[in-house]
Amino acid sequence: MRVDSTVLALVALATDCLGLAIKSNEPELLRRDALPIYKNASYCVDERVRDLLSRMTLEEKAGQLFHKQLSEGPLDDDSSGNSTETMIGKKHMTHFNLASDITNATQTAEFINLIQKRALQTRLGIPITISTDPRHSFTENVGTGFQAGVFSQWPESLGLAALRDPQLVREFAEVAREEYLAVGIRAALHPQVDLSTEPRWARISGTWGENSTLTSELIVEYIKGFQGEGKLGPKSVKTVTKHFPGGGPMENGEDSHFYYGKNQTYPGNNIDEHLIPFKAALAAGATEIMPYYSRPIGTNWEAVGFSFNKEIVTDLLRGELGFDGIVLTDWGLITDTYIGNQYMPARAWGVEYLSELQRAARILDAGCDQFGGEERPELIVQLVREGTISEDRIDVSVARLLKEKFLLGLFDNPFVNASAANNIVGNEHFVNLGRDAQRRSYTLLTNNQTILPLAKPGEGTRFYIEGFDSAFMSARNYTVVNTTEEADFALLRYNAPYEPRNGTFEANFHAGSLAFNATEKARQAKIYSSLPTIVDIILDRPAVIPEVVEQAQAVLASYGSDSEAFLDVVFGVSKPEGKLPFDLPRSMDAVEAQAEDLPFDTENPVFRYGHGLEYEDN
């Protein structure tokens, strides 16, 4: 007989502390009762959760189910009704995503301490959980991640995958954990374990490439590094593994942030392979999962967004895979909004016709616990009071969310040492580790006539450059000229091709064709035919660049690196060690012909997964 996961969760909560209760004696109980149970660290976590839950009003419970972005700033109330003060003081919310650049670690730590202080002033004093999208690399997109700023700067996860070094991934995660902890961030809205089986998809830079086995191997170390020693605890940063059940196979490579990219498809009937990294994450102790916006088409599943889909969340994730942790939806499934000045409808794909109230009910019924990017607790209150959703069902999700706060130690010490933050974040050791990874992750695709490394350019050697500032060359005492006719070598840094999209938010997603247009190809060809040229192609997606490979003297691939890293590799200060984490297709025809859900399905690629040359030892 199949037992509902909701019942199992309540039974577990009621019985986990039984052993402790039996062992208790009366004097000990008297000492422990000096504080409310939920504030008393001598009680086990499940007893504290149960006690706090029993004290909460429906409105306070509803507030726990929402996870909203905020930026650094004052806590004063404002006329829009959505300030931090309103969300904490009136809407009872305690989960926030820090959605702004961090330019001063101490200042950010002080801001988060201020938020925690405000939370302690509420009736029950439930502490705040601060989360963040990735902020240790080069991506700058309010919807997906932030440039490192004051944090140590590493290659994107693709670059870590290119190095195929689980210990390095563990080291990165431990560094990121220390830097997050220093400012008060306790939740990482990553890793992204989608497989990059559709080369046009705009989210590939956040993946670990095309190989499910490699992704699984690396993700285990990633999660363990963020959690620290053992299970989730006071020195942990919890991770949110996404996007279940694997966001890679997007129809035509479009992204489901947007209405035209809402479909996810499996023409190769390869659903199971996309689940492999999630199974590895669960085995490694993942405590939170995020489904993607997409709706599956051409499958036996209902064609509705994954967070609305009970077959996905309850039957597959909780039932078949046995997950009993938190399911956090992706952002903005209920309410239409603006991101910047771009209007964004709620990503309620397949259930657009439902009201906001009905969408919230559908998400809870599917088995999700928390609504990302929303601040609508009044909907939950209405659903319970109307009898659509039981308060017992709300209690199950609230208990999961509270338990996580207790495990993280937030109830016992929500504050950080702000004065120490600047000494931890971006310290010399962490920065050097990131810089070394940037250099090592470079992949040498071609090296005709062994032009690289340019270890000792002769005095007076002149360079034509594109894609980076000449000041980096001047600092090395190299001469930069304005035309190829004057130069001895050309050094070019190019982003992987994409088709710009309209809208301030939409434009951040590199989408569409992976090939340079005819005009740009002709322009580059003139350079390649004029002088020896070294190209660095920045692979946030698998570029279609056979003409570059054929015509340039040497081609390097990178996955998030600064100009100093590029020049160190070019001039032999560092060696490229990376191997391609995906195939590089030969043509857009080949890309369009491949099945979105099958890895390594592109016909006759320019380079296969795993390609990467090495510098010869001189």
UniProtKB/Swiss-Prot annotation:
GO MF, any single term: beta-glucosidase activity
Primary location class: secreted
Glycosylation site positions: 40, 82, 104, 211, 263, 417, 448, 477, 482, 502, 517
Alphabetically ordered keywords of this record: Carbohydrate metabolism, Cellulose degradation, Glycoprotein, Glycosidase, Hydrolase, Polysaccharide degradation, Secreted, Signal
GO CC annotations on file: extracellular region
Keyword Hydrolase: yes
Any single GO BP term: glucan catabolic process
Catalytic reaction annotation: Hydrolysis of terminal, non-reducing beta-D-glucosyl residues with release of beta-D-glucose
Signal peptide: 1-19
Pathway(s) the chain acts in: Glycan metabolism; cellulose degradation
Active site: 330
Gene3D superfamilies linked to this entry: Glycoside hydrolase family 3 C-terminal domain, Glycoside hydrolase, family 3, N-terminal domain
Annotated localization: Secreted
EC number in record: 3.2.1.21
InterPro entries in the cross-refs: Cellulose_Degrad_GH3 (IPR051915), Glyco_hydro_3_C (IPR002772), Glyco_hydro_3_C_sf (IPR036881), Glyco_hydro_3_N (IPR001764), Glyco_hydro_3_N_sf (IPR036962), Glycoside_hydrolase_SF (IPR017853)
Thermal dependence of activity, per record: Optimum temperature is 52 degrees Celsius.
Main function: Beta-glucosidases are one of a number of cellulolytic enzymes involved in the degradation of cellulosic biomass. Catalyzes the last step releasing glucose from the inhibitory cellobiose.
Protein name stated in the entry: Beta-glucosidase C
Organism: Emericella nidulans (strain FGSC A4 / ATCC 38163 / CBS 112.46 / NRRL 194 / M139)
High-level lineage: Eukaryota, Fungi, Dikarya, Ascomycota, Pezizomycotina
